[in-house]
Structures are given as structure tokens and as C-alpha cells.
Amino acid sequence: MSTNPIQPLLDVLYQGKSLNREQTAELFGALIRGEMSEAAMAGMLVALKMRGETIDEISGAADAMRAAAKPFPCPERNNNPLHNGIVDIVGTGGDGFNTINISTTAAFVAAAAGAKVAKHGNRSVSSKSGSSDLLAQFGIDLTMSPETASRCLDALNLCFLFAPHYHGGVKHAVPVRQALKTRTLFNVLGPLINPARPEFMLLGVYSPELVLPIAKVLKALGTKRAMVVHGSGLDEVALHGNTQVAELKDGDIVEYQLTPADLGVPLAQITDLEGGEPAQNALITEAILKGRGTEAHANAVAINAGCALYVCGIADSVKAGTLLALATIQSGKAFELLSQLAKVSGEALVNGQEKGR
């Protein structure tokens, strides 16, 4: 008889049965603490994938990772009803398209328009340049201390939280994930485990089949309001086609589609949004944020920032949010914000505030 406390839970999975939320949290807790062998880890991830993860299982895995994350000292939530929480603009990645850094650029625009944005991100998954790769080009310290990040959020309306800096236990799964060479539950967990615990989310997923399930997971995790989107192949709101949406609001989930016309912008081609290496994408982002980007680039960023502004209550519709985002882009305020964030990040390093992080 096995003395391994997690073996009975693994056996349930091997029988093709589901675990409840608490059981899944127990399994992933063991993984994060380094108490699970690579063989067991692979067996667990494959068993979940082959059957299809339930809402409870995804929520339980997120619970475990949230509980184990490095704490983030959130600044006091503003009592102003238009600024009553934090928003994240995030995607699962893995959509297979090499686009410009839309969600990261949109985060600067939304913050410059008044939203409190805590952007949780990582290095590239499917593109040549992930959010962290882009920010590094601007001299923004990816591993700034939680205290420095919190000060940035409070003073600048924006901070960037580098996932590996807050979720150290995930390192135990890296060899297995690399060896499996297939998507697993980890591919959808990233956006769900932001240590700032945002009340509002614009969350893009790589598959249309994930839109409704992930909205249900966000509801289970206590998210106040969210839009989960898949845009014609992209893990974000699409400029080149329809976007499938599951909107969580007041405890209810409503499904619908958005077109570029609904957002007040013209249709573009996916090729208009093709990105490159981090250095090239940084130049594109700089041009957009200075109000000098191409129409397609500006619109792609604006519709995503606009949906985030709608989700967090600053705009009363996605179209109004998009218009506000476009005006913010033209003002150049978003680039000023990027420059300020890079300056604060650099000063913290020079002053030694990042020691012991």
C-alpha cells in the first residue's frame, strides 16, 4: 500500500474521473512544493488533458498557485466608483500568431486613461516577443520587488508582475512541460494567478472552446467583472474578424460576438499586425504610444484597451472605451507613462531597493 498521500488522487485521474476543487489544489500544492516526481507530474497533466479539465479542477489548480505566490502588497483600493479596483489585460499566449505586443501596449493606454492596471506576464510562448521580452527593451526591470511594483501601481496606475518572480514553484514543472511538447493545464493558468488579484479582467484565450469555461473559472475565483475573448484565432479582441466574448457581470455570464464595427473601427488584415523580434516590437510599441503608429496598430491596441476600460467601469460601453483609448494614444500620455515606469524601475535598481527580493 502506497504511503504517498497524493497517489490516491492520481489514481482517480488515471481512472478517467474528476477531482473536486480541494483535491486538485492538494495535488498542485504538492507539485509547487517539489513533492511530486516528474513521472507523476506528467501522468497528472496528461490524464487531465485527455479527459478535459473541469471548472473545479482549473479553479483548484489556480487556488494552489495563488496561495503559494509571493505576496503582492496592493495599494489601497480607491473609493471612487470609477476606480474601484485593479484590471489585468492578459492572454494565454499560444495562439500561433506572431503579432505585435497588443495586450502589453494596451496596458499602458488603459493606465494612461485612468485604469489601475497590474499586468501579469511572462516571456514569449508563441510569438518572438512576449510581454516581458518587450518591457526589457525599454529598461523596465522584470524582477522589481513587490513593494516597488505596488508603488508604481499606486503612483503611475500601472505595474508589471513577472510571473516566474512570483510563482517560483512552477519551476518544478518546466522539464515535464518541455518534454510533453503539448498544451496542458499550465497553458491557461497564467492569466488566472495574478498576485495582485485583479477585480477586473480582459482575458484572451487561444481557443474558442475555452471562452465560456474560463469565464466560469473566473466567476468561481471571485473575479468581479471580466470579458473572456477569442478573436478569430488570436488570444485578444480582433481587428481582423469577429471576437467571441463571454462577459462576467454581476455574477452572470453572457455570451456574444463583437465586430470591429461594434467597436467603432474599420476591419484590418491579420498581416497588418505582424510582429517581429523584441527590438522591432519595441519600436512599434513606441510609435503607437506616441500617436505615430499605423492605423491598424493603433486600432488593435485601442479596441483591447477600450474593452479593459469598459470592464473596469471607466467607459460605459466597449465603443466608448475604444474612443477614449484612441484619444489617449493620440495625446502621447501612454508613452509618458512608459517612460516614467522605466525611470522608477531604474531608480529602484540604482538605489538598491531591489535587494533581498
Swiss-Prot record:
Tell me the Gene Ontology biological-process terms attached to this UniProt entry: L-tryptophan biosynthetic process
Q: So where does anthranilate 1 get bound?
A: 91, 122
* Record's keyword terms, sorted: Amino-acid biosynthesis, Aromatic amino acid biosynthesis, Glycosyltransferase, Magnesium, Metal-binding, Transferase, Tryptophan biosynthesis
> Which sites bind Mg(2+) 2?
235-236
Q: Does the keyword Hydrolase apply?
A: no
Name its pathway: Amino-acid biosynthesis; L-tryptophan biosynthesis; L-tryptophan from chorismate: step 2/5
Residues holding Mg(2+) 1: 103, 236
GO MF annotation terms: anthranilate phosphoribosyltransferase activity; magnesium ion binding
A UniProt-annotated Pfam family? Glycos_trans_3N
- Ion transport: is it a keyword of this entry? no
Q: Which SUPFAM superfamilies match?
A: Nucleoside phosphorylase/phosphoribosyltransferase catalytic domain, Nucleoside phosphorylase/phosphoribosyltransferase N-terminal domain
The record's GO CC annotations read:
cytosol
Cofactors needed by this protein, per the record, are: Mg(2+)
- Known InterPro entries for this protein? Anthranilate_Pribosyl_Tfrase (IPR005940), Glycosyl_Trfase_fam3 (IPR000312), Glycosyl_Trfase_fam3_N_dom (IPR017459), Glycosyl_Trfase_fam3_N_dom_sf (IPR036320), Nuc_phospho_transferase (IPR035902)
Q: Which reaction does it catalyse?
A: N-(5-phospho-beta-D-ribosyl)anthranilate + diphosphate = 5-phospho-alpha-D-ribose 1-diphosphate + anthranilate
Q: Which residues bind 5-phospho-alpha-D-ribose 1-diphosphate?
A: 91, 94-95, 99, 101-104, 119-127, 131
Which parts of the sequence bind anthranilate 2?
177
**The protein's enzyme class:** transferase
Query: What EC number is given for this enzyme?
Result: 2.4.2.18
Q: Which PANTHER family match?
A: ANTHRANILATE PHOSPHORIBOSYLTRANSFERASE
Similarity remark: Belongs to the anthranilate phosphoribosyltransferase family.
Role this protein plays: Catalyzes the transfer of the phosphoribosyl group of 5-phosphorylribose-1-pyrophosphate (PRPP) to anthranilate to yield N-(5'-phosphoribosyl)-anthranilate (PRA).
Subunit: Homodimer.
Q: What is the recorded name of this protein?
A: Anthranilate phosphoribosyltransferase
Highest classification ranks of the organism: Bacteria, Pseudomonadati, Pseudomonadota, Gammaproteobacteria, Alteromonadales
Please state the gene responsible for encoding this protein: trpD
